[in-house]
Amino acid sequence: MIDEEYKENVEYIRSTIMPKLQKIQRDLAESLPGVSLTVRLDGETGSMSAYAAVFDDTCKVTDCCTANFFYVDNKEEIDDEYNKLAEFLKKYTA
């Protein structure tokens, strides 16, 4: 169960981070084969994780990155996780 003190972080994850990840997923689906982004949201705790993978022509994963957005983290830690994932994806979308 989510503690009262963490509800603001859960809302930040859902209202700020999640839409950014959904936009990345839409962009990847339209223009970049060989890169995938999977997002998982835990409805009970409000935590979220994202897994990005890069595949070669044989569908072998050649690089990957996982970002975890925990409701117990502060906004700076949540933003750091998002930025880590965004930087990883930038290498393959630039």
Where are these regions (language model features)?
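Amphipathic beta-strand/beta-sheet edge segments enriched in Tyr/Trp
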Residues: G46-D57
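Negatively charged, low-complexity tracts enriched in Asp/Glu with abundant Ser/Thr
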Residues: M1-S47, V61-A94
